[in-house]
Amino acid sequence: MPRFFHTLAAFLFVLAFFSTACAQQLGFTIWKGENMVGGITAIRNHAGVNATYAVSSYSELEIVMKQVVRSTMALEYRAGRPFAGFTSLHLNGSLRDSSFMRNMAGTLNCFVHPKEHFTMKEPNAWSTARMYFEEPVGQSTVFVESVMRDCPLTRTAEGVYVLSMPGKKSNIYRYKDGLLQAVEVDRMFVKLVFKRA
């Protein structure tokens, strides 16, 4: 990721924590089976039709050997649409995945680790960051920040949604009375559940 992108990414994340009087903060615990292995903090700041989201997580997993996983995501909305954002995933201190997006003259320039670069005009107003705070009622796609693309969303029961992502990955989101209660993450070597704290 070019140096400019690192600078803007840092700015976005700091912006999400600025103006705490307008901030909404949520906490989730991360579970692997019966063991709590980490936590997630999600923050949203509103300024009219603009908003900034920041989501950070930390977990320690035993998969063959100890794995320390840290993830960070920030997304800025302007006029109700994603405008700029980034994600990063570190495994045992080393960068494993990242993505970055910025708006240039009305076109979103997207970069996905390690070398993918593409542009898009206008992503979905719904994103995984927004799904921490609102139930995506009536939505058939959601913008996924880690891949910088709209991905299919399927409602399978009342308050239950399956988000399908590239690589045959999927997450199950469970809501009650419009509030996110849990996210089930099923990957090749590990199954995790994020539970509302």
Residue ranges and their predicted role:
Residues 2, 61-64, 117, 168:
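Short, structured coil/loop segments at alpha-helix boundaries
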